Design a protein with these regions (language model features):
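Non-heme di-metal
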Residues: 2-365
Length: 365
């Protein structure tokens, strides 16, 4: 006989679970504050050599977070967020922000490098496990790149794309701009890392992309200026990183991956493949944002960045495919599969970040 007894959830167990989660979040927040304090210490490496205990609590939390994010099947969202925020705070020292020069006092710290390497080693293994690298190595690279670019130029609308086009409110649009400002206000910065060295057609094409991103040297035409104008139209913060706390870890991960592949010249093919996807697929995403702005009857200034990007990135996508990655595939036939790896990883991370942004917008609305 079936029992009619109703089993209610164990309130005490649920309470304990919530308290554990809150303690973990608080632990990550405290560790990030400790890390910021370490960043500001003059001569950090020598100070920690003299007093190792000073960084021990942060280091314990860092180790715990790496295990929680990458060490089991059930990834911990808060651990991911903590790690990507720490990694970004280290990586951002590679750029100059026109702020207090003392902020760069530890830019070459071996301790910071050690923290970065600990995170990157575990994180990159976790990311690579999501790609069938062996399968990529068997493909006709040039054919696969052309096929991918053709498919990603005008992809079918996803559920998230339809939501942005048809349902997102003005409040949601402002939230989109807030998150988007994380990249939009410093656009193209990391591309600079791969432009030095021997002159050739590939290098010159990349320089052309950068020059257009930077408005041909005119601040009024720089892409980030158009993004700032969109923010200003709503009375929003136009300072870089002004909405850093809103940025999902998935977006931070894409930026940190970009720092990694531009910083290491051995990953030049991966970066080139990634940039090709970014330039090819960008216009489709921007058309969604533009459609939303037009539906909401926003001003030209509130959507001008999207219109500019659609025009220019369609051209940049063709340049990247024809003059960069196909050329590199011929120049490095044994390693050309890395172009596909970079392309596919950028797509995977980009899709993951886009989904996270839409979830954040829905929550904000």
């Amino acid at each position: 006989m079936q029992s009619n007894l109703v089993i209610f959830p164990n309130a005490e167990a649920a309470k304990n679970s919530t308290q554990t989660e809150e303690r973990t979040i608080t632990k990550y927040e405290r560790a990030e504050e400790q890390f910021l304090e370490l960043l500001a210490i003059e001569d950090l490496d020598n100070k920690l050599d003299a007093n190792p205990v000073r960084g021990s609590e942060f280091e314990q939390t860092l180790s715990m977070a790496i295990g929680a994010a990458y060490g089991n099947d059930r990834s911990d969202e808060q651990a991911h967020r903590f790690l990507q925020r720490i990694l970004y705070r280290i990586n951002r020292l590679k750029l100059f922000w026109y702020d207090d020069l003392q902020n760069y006092t530890n830019e070459r710290s071996l301790y910071l490098y050690s923290c970065r390497d600990q995170i990157e080693t575990a994180w990159q293994q976790w990311e690579l496990a999501q790609i069938d690298v062996a399968a990529l190595q068997q493909l006709d690279v040039k054919h696969a790149l052309i096929e991918r670019a053709s498919a990603d130029l005008n992809p079918p609308l996803s559920e998230s794309s339809r939501y942005i086009r048809e349902e997102m409110t003005e409040a949601g649009y402002r939230h989109l701009l807030a998150i988007g400002s994380f990249d939009g206000l410093v656009e193209g910065s990391r591309l600079c890392y791969v432009l030095g060295g021997a002159a050739n057609e590939v290098q010159c094409t990349l320089v052309r992309v950068l020059i257009e991103e930077y408005g041909n040297g005119r601040l009024s035409r720089k892409h980030s200026t158009f993004f700032a104008q969109m923010l200003a139209e709503f009375g929003m913060n136009t300072e870089p990183e002004g909405y850093f706390d809103l940025v999902p870890w998935q977006v931070l991960a894409a930026a940190n991956h970009n720092f990694l592949t531009t910083d290491r010249k051995r990953y030049f093919l991966r970066y080139s493949g990634a940039l090709t996807y970014f330039e090819v697929a960008g216009p489709a995403a921007y058309k969604n944002y533009l459609a939303a702005a037009q539906r909401l009857e926003l001003s030209e200034a509130a959507m001008g960045y999207w219109e500019l990007h659609i025009r220019e990135d369609e051209r940049h996508g063709r340049w990247m495919l024809d003059d960069v990655v196909l050329s590199l595939a011929e120049r490095y036939p044994n390693d050309a599969w890395e172009l596909l790896l970079g392309y596919d990883q950028e797509k995977l991370m980009g899709d993951r970040a886009a989904d996270a942004v839409v979830r954040s917008i829905r929550e904000a609305e």
